[in-house]
Amino acid sequence: MTSVLIIGGGGMIGQKLASSYAKSETVSLLDMAFPENSDLNVKKILGSVSDASIMEKTLSELPGTIFYLASIVSGEAETNFSKGWDINVHAFWSFLAQIRDQYLKSEGQYKPKIIFTSSIAVFGSPFPNKISDDFLTAPRTSYGAQKVCCELMLNDFIRKGFCEGLAIRLPTICVRPGKPNLAASSFFSGIIREPLNGLKANLPVSTDVRHWHASPRSAVGFLRHAESLDRNAMTFNGALNMPGLSCTVEEQIEALRSIAGNEAVKLIEAKPDEK
């Protein structure tokens, strides 16, 4: 039986991913905080990915599969430049270095499978109608640049034989439950979630903006499928684009109208924001 470690397991996707495993599986979650109402039968480790001692202790248990979900989200990575690079890149490098240390200590016997959640933010415009896995990565944000760096680092550690795994580029997850986060794409969920709860929602872009979405359930499915893949049987650059639903903001709004009516749509307020 392979043990599973979910780094960033306190978040929405991490919690859903953990719940997808049978109770007989050994699952550990590491994060800064966890939902109070969670009844998951898992080991919870409080700590930051930037804390080398906590990471060393956690990895000393030699988990067979590691999902690396932890990150500073796009909006915060842009406004807090140093924090974005420290958490999204430097901490990931430290994590990989510790994986290599465990590999060397075991004389090559320990080679975990690492599934890293990257993002469509690695791409920059202009876009083709269909974006392939090997489309040029030319990010226009710090967050996107940080994700590209992590993809390349992971790919090199895999090439050197220190671990197995791959990076998967998730579309924007929509609709996210709960409160808005600091992601630049948070409004895509907000313009649906808030009106359905009788609350106003800000729309910072024009309604002809087209974006790429996937549901939380789909995201968990992508992660579990990635866990089952044999990297040796694949010929690719180490990162795969995940499928999603492409739609405009206007199409989102019309879908809301068809479900909740005009009164819900009236709660969406256009407030252009070039950021």
Predicted features, each with a name:
Residues N155-R210, P216, V220-G221:
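NAD(P)-dependent short-chain dehydrogenase/reductase
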Residues S50, T79, K83-S94, T137, ...:
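Glycine-rich NAD(P)-binding loop of the Rossmann-fold in SDR/ketoreductase-type enzymes
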Residues V49-I87:
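NAD(P)H-binding glycine-rich loop region in Rossmannoid oxidoreductase-like domains
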Residues S125, R140-L166:
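Active-site Tyr-X1-5-Lys
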Residues V4-K23:
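N-terminal Rossmann NAD(P)H-binding glycine-rich loop of SDR-like oxidoreductase domains
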Residues L40-D51:
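Rossmann-fold cofactor-recognition segment
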Residues P204-S206, W212-K275:
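C-terminal substrate-binding subdomain of Rossmann-fold SDR/epimerase-dehydratase oxidoreductases
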Residues W93-R140:
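Conserved Rossmann-fold NAD(P)-dependent oxidoreductase catalytic core, especially the SDR/UDP-sugar
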